[in-house]
Amino acid sequence: MERRAFLKLAAAGAALVAGGQVATMLGLLERVSASDLPATGPGAAHQWVFIIDLRRCDGCGECTTACQTEHFLPADQEWIRVYRLTDASGGDYFLPVMCQMCERPPCVQVCPVTATYRTDDGPIAIDQSICIGCRMCMAACPYGVRTFNWDEPVAVPEEARHDGPDLQIPQVQGTVGKCDNCAHLAREGDLPACVSKCGMEAVYMGDLVTD
């Protein structure tokens, strides 16, 4: 098996185990045709994307911690998860997985209240003010990277609070959360938290339109 194929299978397998929604997800995906899903529109000013160099990642988890700190997430919520995997030759490597901001996102298609949508510059966002917590998007996500806010939000300083789909601090109880590409930082010309805190320089962010 080629390494690329192995990585895709390993990532999908880990996501399915983490999500615990195998049967439900497969049923949804059978009903969703990729050709029916919205792609990024032409003429967009930006198209933010992540690139991860697996040769550099040492599994330190600093990206996860940085994300949690930036978004005031509890310790049990990981918007970027680092998996330890073994390749066909028996060697170990680490695979960070976050929201892939799919070109044709199943989560957008299945959301019954349009709480999940694509922004003009590419990232898939969640408007927690209208999310009903049905978790259909979690079942549809092929990467298992969405989390549910079961508990009351963590204590957050007043100056750090922010309400909006681009940045929700703290998270709203009873809704779904996920990587937001640190869009609030990117629009100011700054790097996402996971990128700036990666000591191995394994995580990159680029713009498919301008770079």
Residue ranges of each PLM-predicted region?
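Short Fe-S-cluster ligation motifs
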Residues: 89-104, 138-145, 161-184
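C-terminal segment of N-terminal export signals and the immediately downstream linker at the start
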Residues: 2, 21-59
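Short, well-ordered beta-strand elements within core beta-sheets of diverse protein domains
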Residues: 52-55, 180-186
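Iron-sulfur cluster-binding cysteine motifs and their immediate structural context
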Residues: 21, 28-33, 58, 62-82, ...
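N-terminal secretory signal peptides and thylakoid transit peptides that target proteins
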Residues: 1-17
